Regions:
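Domain-level signature for proteins that mediate thiol-based redox and metal-cofactor handling
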Residues: 1-185
Length: 185
């Protein structure tokens, strides 16, 4: 098994591409060992000293470090990923549900505007962000403000504020005049 690695805009996060599907639907962002109990692979990764976050996408895994150098962490992370996939173990523990983004909020009168915002995020924003090892999902829309959840490499990335303000906000304002601002949640 060959696992590729890619740098992300966040220097504390690396993207690992195992060359096979990772998560069937959506994404899953795990920020501590307690949350990692949902996934045998995440438990293995959080067992490595210095790992502070694990994010699963359709065909990639991003790992965030709190401490340590990538030179020391990367071989251990690669080993844990390889062991997991070679064992045939499931990504999610029995009884763990696939992730859901059901807790959205917006006024029903804004449903058409929200549909346009979500389509732009799905078609223009998420594919670009996934290339960097992260994900951005719609959370809500209220009084002209779009609320987004930043996950994976995007969470805590030094350039995420610029991406949000200059990239995503400008895109949404261009296509959806009702949008005045974009904020992270």
């Amino acid at each position: 098994m060959f696992i590729q690695t890619e740098a992300t805009p966040n220097p504390a996060t690396l993207k690992f591409l195992p060359g096979r599907p990772v998560l069937e639907n959506g994404t899953l962002d795990l920020r501590d060992a307690e949350q990692a109990a949902q996934s045998p692979l995440a438990e293995r990764l959080f067992g490595i000293a210095g790992v502070s976050g694990v994010f699963f996408g359709a065909d990639f895994i991003t790992v965030t470090k709190a401490a340590g150098e990538w030179q020391q962490l990367k071989p251990m992370i690669l080993g844990a990923i390889m062991e997991h996939f070679m064992s045939g173990a499931p990504l999610l523990a029995a009884g763990s549900a696939q992730p859901s983004d059901a807790d959205e909020f917006f006024d029903s009168a804004d449903a058409e505007t929200v549909a346009t915002i979500k389509e732009l995020i799905e078609t223009r924003v998420r594919p670009a962000v996934a290339n960097d090892g992260g994900d951005i999902t719609f959370r809500g829309f209220k009084d002209g403000v779009v609320y987004l959840n930043m996950k994976g490499a995007c969470s805590g990335c030094p350039s995420s504020t610029a991406t949000l303000r200059h990239g995503i906000q400008n895109l949404l304002r261009h296509y959806v005049p009702d949008v005045t601002e974009v904020r992270p949640m």
